[in-house]
């Protein structure tokens, strides 16, 4: 389903809000220049600093403007399991092809806590979930063993931004 270059989009702002015109131009720029897929509301898109309304709008606009030309992998992660479920459910209803879910940041969950977090999201949502392991930002590193456990129930993709060569 996902191949090639899937670009993490920035979220442009103007004055006190989302610059929708610039964002739409950015989406079309990537599609017109051969990008394989779009990733709105990820770390590059400043997802932790977006309001819920902004977050949802960024995802909705990306899905609408891409119009099925390329897959959309919506950033829906949160340190709150219920919030991640809510954001993922919204992305699914809006038409996202998958969700990019960052490991819960700040709270430092155990490996079992990480497993339960992703399992709860997977159990409530019907789109593929990509595990986004980025310990330099989230302050938690998902172990390979935890990833292997998660793969047992359809979490088939990982974006691993760990600095450790041994984790590859």
Regions found by a protein language model. Name each.
Residues 14, 19-139:
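Active-site beta->alpha loop and helix N-cap motifs at the rims of alpha/beta catalytic domains
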Residues 126, 144, 164:
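ATP/adenylate-binding site constellation spanning eukaryotic-like Ser/Thr protein kinases
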Residues 157-168:
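Single conserved hydrophobic/aromatic residue that forms the stacking wall/gate
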């Amino acid at each position: 389903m996902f191949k090639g270059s899937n670009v993490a989009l920035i979220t442009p702002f103007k004055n006190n809000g989302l610059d929708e015109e610039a964002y739409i131009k950015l989406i079309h720029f990537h599609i017109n220049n051969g990008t394989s897929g779009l990733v709105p509301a990820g770390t590059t898109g400043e997802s932790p600093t977006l309001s819920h309304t902004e977050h949802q709008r960024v995802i909705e606009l990306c899905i609408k403007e891409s119009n099925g030309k390329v897959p959309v992998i919506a950033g829906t992660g949160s340190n709150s399991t219920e919030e991640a479920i809510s954001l993922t459910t919204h992305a699914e209803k809006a038409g996202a092809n998958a969700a990019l879910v960052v490991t819960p940041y700040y709270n430092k969950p155990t490996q079992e806590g990480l497993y339960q977090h992703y399992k709860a999201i997977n159990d409530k949502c019907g789109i593929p979930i990509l595990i986004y392991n980025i310990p330099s930002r989230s302050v938690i590193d998902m172990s390979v063993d935890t990833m292997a456990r998660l793969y047992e129930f359809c979490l088939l993709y990982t974006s691993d931004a760990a600095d450790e060569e041994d984790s590859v």
